[in-house]
Amino acid sequence: MAYVDGFVAAVPRANKEAYLRSARAGAKLFLEWGASRVVENWEDDVPNGKLTDFRRAVAAKEDEVIVFSWIEYPDKATREAVQKKMIESPEMGAMEMPFDMGRLIFGVFETLLDV
């Protein structure tokens, strides 16, 4: 069964190109290490909710957009191996993220349906 790392972040609108550069560099490594796919999505239409929403979940500021991303793996074992490589990687450690990592939300998911 496929595994997915999911992420939601608030990125300053002005940092779109810097974000894309860091995302490309990270994606290259994740794919080399065994990930099946890396997807990065830049906010187009993220409405405010009545109770909660993406913007509140990451305490997005007025000048920030929501980025919704995921990394797919063929199975849990591959995901765990990739995570180990990520933690040990000097390249990942040296990457500067163009957003506040403290407000990043993430989780690991088992694919339930993929049609």
What are these regions (language model features)?
Residues M1-A18, A25:
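Long, hydrophobic N-terminal alpha-helical segment
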Residues A18-L31, I66-W70:
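Generic detector of contiguous secondary-structure segments
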Residues L31, A35-E62, E88-V115:
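Glycine-rich beta-strand-turn "strand-cap" elements at beta-sheet edges
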